[in-house]
């Protein structure tokens, strides 16, 4: 498959080192690298001069920062200088998360800031490993406020070595992706470009036809009002939690953790999915049609089944007098719902559905087709399988497989962002104004049915292993008592189930949190597998010593079952023998461990990281328990 046309812009990696006094923050060092040469600055005006020079030398340039949201908070004054000089500034920011900021001097000279984490969502240490360019350790340890007061900022100082390496890693990684044709701002954008190009290839000549209308006929532009209405029926993955507390595996009742090999990719490959402009009707479609229904229903859980459905809209919970996020067992009032035909079938397996006779249902009926992206998936699967695990090519190919479906659900609502000086903040800030992208090329029904099939496939395994045996489910995995079921397909290829682990015990905590004990006695973090939303799982630079908030859970796994427990201490004492041993052997003090997590806070001049605690919570006040 020929890659999309390469972007002509010159690619750079950038990094900032910053300091703060607890109330305000400032730039200490700036490095912009093309992987071979580096440009150093120590203030806003210096960065502005460097960017101007690079634009005049190369025309259009793209500078990637790893975690642009953080760095952009310091670069706002630089952007403001260009803006005041009548340069055009266009910022793409979604939900306060910047995707890109483009500064245009004239038709042939521009700089675009992008976030390399949007293309490789890994920390910089992992990215360095992917390209064989290890991240260096800071010679100054942690960056406490005032850390830079003795820094040597002279041209040939060794104090530039650390930031140079970080900028080099970003530059080399992004340049490799651009050279291979992955030139969009995000991984999903890369996938979208490649998929559209693949659809436009002439099967006879094998060449891409930029004027081909096949994509538009398959995924036509939908009216914004229809998109908004159907969006009420778009939902993501499921999370189910039962048997909370500690459970031990036995020979008679083992514990099995199963995962699907690429859930969404398998749906794209094998399942019939909607295409084209839907036909509207008030009559129930035939069973073999794909449709979206607007219906009014009541639900009641069937005997022997587990409840899993949640209302997406807060008003539905209010009607029942429930907190938002409640798992539905039985409803006592009618609810107008937007549901795909796949979801209606899945619901009918677990719930008795009563339809309101006084409500006239409405349906959007779609044509359907399977395997539209078969060639795309096979291509990137082959790239992944031919690449060494952990390399940039392997990681990026995996992202190309997994990132395509979500782009279909991109909302037409967007933002116009202007950089203005706010007197109240004493700093520059982005002022957002909601607007509509009337020409959006997203096609929401495709994403609606992809996630609906994924939920159905997950619940198919739930029924196969027995509802009473289910411990935890999350999007594409099921943890349960007992062996794998022979009623679902197991294997190594796309869409089959595989054994992730067979733990000897599990601590089931609730919504997106559990700890599996893979073997006793516990002697290292490798003997444990953990999932806990909101709790970072970090190691020290050696990769041997766990640090931060999850230390409290490793130290006593039973804590993950304590809903409402607060994690995070400035001076935590480790109690478990195995974890104390690891700390002592690696030169750390197990009696004085900071387990707080760092949360960014915007201050005048930029961003500082504040220590914060975390409460273990199901993100719902009520959760069905057995």
Task: Kindly give the residue locations of the regions a language model identified.
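Ser/Thr-glycine-rich phosphate-binding loops at phosphate-binding pockets of nucleotides
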Residues: 15-20
């Amino acid at each position: 498959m020929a890659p999309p046309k390469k972007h002509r812009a010159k690619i750079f990696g950038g990094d900032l080192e910053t300091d703060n006094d607890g109330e305000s923050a400032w730039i200490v060092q700036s490095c912009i690298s093309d992987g071979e040469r580096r440009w150093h600055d120590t203030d806003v005006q210096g960065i502005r001069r460097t960017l101007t020079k690079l634009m005049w030398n190369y025309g259009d340039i793209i500078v990637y920062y790893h975690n642009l949201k953080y760095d952009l908070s310091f670069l706002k004054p630089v952007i403001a200088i260009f803006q005041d000089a009548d340069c055009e500034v266009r910022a793409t920011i979604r939900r306060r998360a910047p995707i890109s900021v483009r500064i245009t001097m004239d038709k042939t000279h521009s700089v675009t800031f992008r976030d390399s984490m949007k293309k490789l969502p890994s920390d910089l240490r992992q990215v360095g490993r992917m390209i064989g360019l290890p991240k260096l350790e800071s010679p100054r340890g942690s960056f406490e406020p005032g850390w830079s007061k003795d820094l040597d900022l002279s041209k040939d100082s060794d104090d530039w070595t650390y930031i140079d390496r970080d900028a080099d890693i970003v530059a080399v990684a992004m340049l490799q992706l651009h050279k291979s044709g992955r030139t969009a701002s995000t991984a999903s954008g890369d996938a979208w470009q490649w998929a559209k190009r693949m659809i436009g290839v002439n099967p006879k000549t094998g060449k891409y036809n930029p004027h081909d209308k096949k994509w538009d006929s398959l995924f036509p532009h939908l009216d914004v009002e229809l998109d908004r209405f159907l969006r009420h029926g778009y939902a993501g993955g499921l999370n189910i939690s039962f048997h909370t507390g500690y459970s031990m595996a036995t020979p008679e009742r083992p514990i099995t953790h199963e995962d699907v090999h690429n859930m969404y990719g398998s749906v794209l490959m094998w399942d019939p999915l909607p295409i084209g402009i839907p036909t509207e009707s008030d009559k129930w479609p035939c069973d073999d049609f794909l449709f979206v229904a607007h219906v009014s229903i009541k639900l009641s859980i069937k005997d022997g089944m587990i409840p899993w459905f949640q209302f997406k809209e807060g008003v539905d919970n209010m009607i029942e007098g429930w907190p938002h996020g409640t798992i539905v067992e039985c409803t006592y009032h009618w609810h107008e719902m937007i549901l795909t035909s796949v979801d209606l079938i899945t619901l009918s397996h677990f719930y008795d559905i009563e339809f309101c006779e006084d409500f006239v249902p409405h349906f959007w009926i779609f044509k359907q087709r399977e395997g539209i992206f078969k060639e795309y998936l096979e291509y990137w699967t082959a790239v992944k399988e031919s690449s060494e695990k952990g390399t940039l090519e392997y990681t990026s190919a995996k992202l190309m497989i997994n990132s395509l479906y979500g782009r279909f659900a991109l909302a037409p609502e967007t933002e116009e962002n202007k950089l203005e000086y706010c007197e109240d903040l004493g700093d520059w800030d982005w002022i957002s104004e909601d607007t509509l992208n009337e020409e959006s090329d997203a096609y929401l029904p495709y994403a609606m049915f992809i996630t609906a099939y994924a939920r159905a496939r997950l619940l198919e395994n739930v029924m196969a292993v027995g509802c009473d045996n289910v411990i935890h489910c999350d999007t594409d995995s099921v943890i349960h008592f007992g062996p794998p079921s022979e009623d679902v397909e197991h294997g190594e290829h796309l869409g089959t189930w595989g054994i992730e682990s067979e733990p000897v015990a599990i601590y089931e905590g609730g919504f997106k949190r559990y700890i599996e004990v893979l073997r006793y006695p516990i002697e290292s973090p490798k003997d444990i597998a953990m999932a806990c939303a909101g709790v970072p799982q970090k190691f020290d630079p050696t990769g041997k010593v766990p640090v931060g908030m999850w230390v409290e859970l490793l130290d006593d796994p039973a804590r993950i079952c304590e809903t409402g427990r607060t994690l995070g201490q400035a001076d935590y004492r480790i109690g478990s023998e195995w974890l104390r041993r690891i700390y002592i052997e690696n030169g750390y003090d197990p009696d004085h461990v900071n387990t707080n997590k760092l949360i960014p806070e915007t201050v005048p001049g930029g961003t500082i990281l504040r220590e914060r605690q975390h409460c273990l919570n199901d993100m719902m006040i009520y959760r069905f328990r057995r």
